[in-house]
Amino acid sequence: MSDTPHEPGKISYPAEVVLKPWGWEKIWAHTDKYVGKILHINPGHRLSLQYHEVKDETIHVLSGILKVYSTKLQIEHTMSEGMSWHIIPGQIHRFEAPEGGQPVVLLEVSTPELDDVVRLKDDYNRVDD
């Protein structure tokens, strides 16, 4: 994954696809002020239980049913197409595409700190020590 922002004023550039153990993400915008991604979560998979120290993000469900967890808000909630969630720095959260369902596709817009992830639990042994 490149941390180099896209060239200002350039009309078209290839989106960067990053394979993940839970699916993939496509980085379609990367500037010094924001990042835009599309996340594809395979059924039965989930992202790390994590938080960000600086990164501020908002997700929007494009398709599928997304299970979200937040320990700060003490919620386990289901989001469907058209729903959005703003996640602030320090808020512990996790996304999941339920087993037997459809893949979940999310639009994510965030501040540009791509490597600001503190993993607390992870199904793929990527927990930070």
Residue ranges, per PLM feature:
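Short acidic-glycine-tyrosine-enriched beta hairpin
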Residues: 72-92
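A short glycine-rich, His/Asp/Glu-containing loop-to-beta-strand
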Residues: 13-55
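Double-stranded beta-helix
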Residues: 2-14, 18-20, 94-129
